[in-house]
From Swiss-Prot:
Top-level taxonomy: Bacteria, Bacillati, Cyanobacteriota, Cyanophyceae, Synechococcales
NCBIfam families assigned: L3_bact (TIGR03625)
GO CC terms, sorted: cytosolic large ribosomal subunit
GO process terms (BP): translation
Gene for this chain: rplC
Biased composition (Low complexity): 142-153
InterPro entries xref list: Ribosomal_uL3, Ribosomal_uL3_bac/org-type, Ribosomal_uL3_CS, Transl_B-barrel_sf
Pfam annotation, one family: Ribosomal_L3
Name of the featured protein: Large ribosomal subunit protein uL3
SUPFAM superfamilies registered for this protein in UniProt: Translation proteins (SSF50447)
Quaternary assembly: Part of the 50S ribosomal subunit. Forms a cluster with proteins L14 and L19.
Protein function: One of the primary rRNA binding proteins, it binds directly near the 3'-end of the 23S rRNA, where it nucleates assembly of the 50S subunit.
Region annotation (Disordered) ranges: 127-162
Span of the signal peptide: none
Length: 217
């Protein structure tokens, strides 16, 4: 499996295709990332490539982590991510990972932290139907029954109820790469991706067999 790249979500915009149709797109500042470590079966029990992204101040980095990062370059990096690979001979510590690793027409999987919406009710969080809104109704946005009575005498774990909505790590798969600007480290993908503008996201090649740009992991 090929390694991915870390980036920052800039926001959404639109492009127009050859027929004049508006296509919603997300702009991503992808990389550049630096290879900070190569893990091997002999030393670590598995093979992987670790990359770093985003500059960090010296006061925010612990001494052990600082020593680890300085082995691959002079700049201290804020975010680290590793990718499992079959072998590490084609990678070298200190090398840069950029948007040139991707190509237009390729499909990618993008992971990020979804936007937190705080405490939300049944309708907003789970899409429940509401009750009658007419005068006299006492069940406008109530959930209805949450279970039986004496047996089981409790609410089963996992019951869909009101609670904290969003703020979870999710992945959107099979997004099409429409445009690449390697001068600005810009990656343009079709559709939306998790997170708010400015959030850190992980972009990796789609591994669904049979899809364009995908490969067998």
């Amino acid at each position: 499996m090929s390694i991915g790249i870390l980036g920052k979500k800039l926001g959404m915009s639109q492009l127009f295709d050859e027929k004049g149709n508006s296509v919603p797109v997300t702009l991503i500042e992808a990389g550049p990332c630096r290879i900070t470590q190569l893990k091997t079966t002999a030393l670590d029990g598995y093979t992987a490539v670790q990359i770093g992204y985003g500059l960090s101040k010296d006061k925010h980095i612990s001494k052990p982590e600082k020593g680890h990062l300085l082995k691959s370059g002079e700049e201290l990096l804020k975010h680290l991510k590793e990718y499992r690979v079959e072998e590490t001979s084609s990678y070298e510590i200190g090398n840069q990972i950029t948007v040139k690793n991707f190509e237009v027409g390729q499909k990618v999987d993008i992971s990020g932290k979804s936007m937190g919406r705080g405490f939300a009710g049944y309708q907003k969080r789970h899409g429940f139907s509401r009750g009658p809104m007419s005068h006299g109704s006492k069940n406008h946005r109530a959930p209805g029954s949450t279970g039986a009575g004496t047996t089981p005498g409790r609410i089963y774990p996992g019951k869909r109820m009101a609670g904290r909505y969003g703020g979870k790590q999710i992945t959107t798969k099979g997004l099409l790469v429409l445009k690449i600007d390697d001068q600005k480290n810009l990656l343009v993908v079709k559709g939306s991706v998790p997170g708010k503008p400015g959030s850190i996201i992980n972009i990796k090649p789609n591994n669904i067999v049979g899809k364009k740009g995908g490969e067998k992991s």
